[in-house]
Amino acid sequence: MALTIARTETQLAATTAFQAMDNLMASTVSSSFVVPANVSKLVSVDVGITADGAEECAALLRFAGNGLADGEQYTVCSSIVNAGSATGTSNNYVSKDTDFNVISGNSIECSIAVTDATTISAAVVMTFA
């Protein structure tokens, strides 16, 4: 059975420093979460990201914490490119199959950073099995 955990950020002043994703839509949640019981892998990561106006960036997700058996793991998000005639930009979401070993009952934090300081909104769904 697969289980999912989601995190979002809206209008985040993203930088090259990783920032914890500590929202779930309108709700503020813990920046870390407990790996669900009876799972051993983070099997996929789905992420959608958008930037304001003519901003552009490439984004990276970091998964860190004692819930990762093999240490920190990373996945890349879609890159955002300048769309001069638009009032915002968006790209297709990324669906990434992963094979990250996890430890049930321990914690993981999902954080995001970008190559160029940019105001972004992002949504991430992590699937465990």
Model-derived features with residue positions:
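Short edge beta-strand/loop segments characteristic of extracellular beta-sandwich folds
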Residues: D46-T50
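Terminal beta-strand-rich extracellular "head" domains
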Residues: A54-T98
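Beta-strand-rich interaction surfaces with strong enrichment in secreted/lumenal proteins
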Residues: S31-F33, K96-F100
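C-terminal interaction-tip segments
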Residues: M1-N23, T28-P36, D52, A113-A129
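Extended extracellular/luminal ectodomain segments enriched in beta-structured repeat modules
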Residues: P36-S44, G105
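Short beta-strand/loop motifs in extracellular/secreted proteins, especially
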Residues: K41-V43, E55-A59, T118-A122
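Noncatalytic modules at the cell exterior or secretory-pathway interfaces
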Residues: D99-D116
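Residues that act as N-cap/strand-start positions at coil-to-secondary-structure junctions
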Residues: S27-V29, V43, N92-V94
